[in-house]
Amino acid sequence: MYQTNKKATTNCIGIEYLQNAFEPEEIEELENNLNKFGIKLKTYSSAPKYIMGIEELFPQIQIFLSSDIAQAIYLGIASSAIWDGIKLFFRSLKNIVKKKTFTHVSNNKVNTKATPNIHVTIGESHIVLPIDIDDSKFEYFVDKMFDSMDKDIVNEEKYVFYDAEKQTFEYYTRHEVTMKSYQDWKEKQNSTETTTEE
């Protein structure tokens, strides 16, 4: 295991995470799984931070695919070994994260069963990993996550969310994510006020 800068090179996956999000043996497991498929893992841990903004825009764990891997996937020329390695990586990551305790503090409320915000970053696009869905739906997500991505989407700042019920990918700009978050907050506030009045 080695920590380096965030730039991913040929056949490489980078992972940036908050300190203490993973144990050394968990990173080693991810690294060993990728090595079997000829893919290197580069890691970068950063100090925990307070977020003053829309949470969906700030991942606690961020995954970077090297441009060579991303391009091979888009062109449909990724070897089965690389594709199998990527699928195993995401499956292993989900299993590791689901066993861990993440704490979220907001408005003086502490949630000790929080799900971390995980992004897969390709170019300017961020695919938000749906960790809270069952394994079969997650497998489907991983199989399909690159299908609708193309060069234009990758070159624009987009946030990609997966709707497990509809099995669709929804694309939003940063502004749209902000507006959606505000609308959700507003509806929640109105709902709370209505309940209080009753």
Predicted regions span which residues?
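Ordered, amphipathic secondary-structure segments that act as subunit-interaction surfaces
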Residues: 72-96
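Short amphipathic alpha-helical segments that predominantly mediate membrane engagement
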Residues: 1-65, 87-198
